[in-house]
Amino acid sequence: MKIYDFVNSELEFLRAECNFSDEELEYFNLRAKHYSNLQISLIVNVSEAKVSVLAKRVKTKIKKVL
């Protein structure tokens, strides 16, 4: 599952239904714009390991909703 493959209506649905934390939502929005995990870590000034944790949490929430 690639977040950037979702269409806008699906992205809006997931934003509304997944109850993302602020960090998770920021990650979700950046991935929707095709940013890589490395780019995201540089933008939000966290380690790549932290971004990997965010990715896992976001994907888990998406799978629960879908």
Predicted feature descriptions by range:
Residues 39, 50:
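Residues in the helix-turn-helix
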Residues 59-66:
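Short, Lys/Arg-enriched C-terminal cap helix and immediately downstream tail that follows
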Residues 17-24:
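Short helix-coil-helix linker/hinge
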Residues 40-44:
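Short alpha-helical "recognition helix" segments of helix-turn-helix
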